A protein has these predicted regions:
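Ferredoxin-reductase
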Residues: 2-91, 150-152
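FNR/FR-type flavoprotein reductase catalytic core
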Residues: 79-241
Length: 277
């Protein structure tokens, strides 16, 4: 197990521009140097630092079954991400982790899986999808349904992978954008409306959500209305974290620390948190 306070040196192997809109998101494929390794499971996160700039938490975006590299999908939005977006292949960064709890992949076995993601919210769910769709694990889970939403076609991340995902056995993808665009052949509308039109095996389904807070609020309410228990509706609160080890207090909600007790929570747990959340 890695020392949670000790950053490890890593090298950027590849930078992939994900979005073609003003929403600037890049995926970084990185490898730990000096024989370092980092075993993680879906839902966990990492702390990335750039000397002289700062440190910030990011959810893993790659399959936990790939040990050769780590992928992180990052939006340019602050000091650390601004500096990171200026780096090229071969540049060095520092990583420490992994931190946090995981999606309950064992409990989710023998259930159907409904994944609803908005924009960059697909990034922390990608490790879960890749884990479940992998041939070594696929038979453990039932049908996988995805509802992937973005404001515009240029805001989707991982579009190059959608066709491959759709070819996985018992897997389907519905894509939607907020407003009509020329040449778009997917859905137009908001996730909380479209999920009501989907055929969901309510008693045997786990729902996993990630996206803007307003999306999670309305989608989770719709899923509860449809009959999915709150205990089987999962999300991640990684945006609320800073230090990763429960020391800074920024992610404290009531008696819980998101970086330690989370970032993965079910809706029953969230319902017990203070109303200001």
């Amino acid at each position: 197990m890695n020392n949670p306070y000790l950053p490890l040196k890593a090298e950027i192997l590849e930078v992939i521009q994900e979005t073609t809109s003003e929403l600037d998101i890049k995926t970084y494929k990185v490898k730990l140097l000096d024989g370092g390794s980092m075993d993680f499971m879906p839902g966990q996160f990492i702390e990335l630092s750039i000397p002289g700039v700062g440190e910030a938490p990011f959810g893993f975006a790659s399959s936990p079954l790939d040990r050769e590299y780590i992928e992180l999908s990052i939006k340019r939005v602050g000091l650390v991400t601004e500096a990171l977006h200026s780096l090229k292949e071969g540049a060095g960064i520092w990583l420490r982790g992994p931190f946090g709890n995981t999606f309950p992949v064992k409990e989710m076995e023998n259930n159907k899986i409904l994944v609803i993601a908005g924009g960059l919210g697909l990034a922390p769910l990608r490790p879960l999808l890749l884990y479940m769709m992998d041939g070594r694990n696929r038979e453990r889970y039932g049908e996988i349904q995805m509802l992937l939403a973005a404001r515009s076609t240029g805001d989707f991340i991982y579009r190059r992978e959608f066709d491959e995902w759709g070819r996985v056995e018992a897997t389907s993808i519905v894509k939607t954008i907020d407003r009509p665009e020329e040449g778009w052949d997917g859905k137009v509308g908001f996730p909380h409306v479209l999920v009501g039109e989907m055929e969901i095996d309510v008693p045997n389904t786990y729902a996993v959500l990630c996206g803007p807070p307003i999306m999670i609020k309305f989608v989770s309410a719709k899923l509860v209305e449809l009959g999915i228990p709150k205990e089987k509706i999962l999300t991640t609160l990684e945006m609320r974290m800073t230090c990763g080890v429960g020391k800074c207090g920024k992610c404290n909600i009531g008696h819980q620390y998101v970086c330690i007790d989370g970032p993965v929570f079910n809706m029953a747990q969230l319902a017990e948190m203070p109303s200001e959340y």
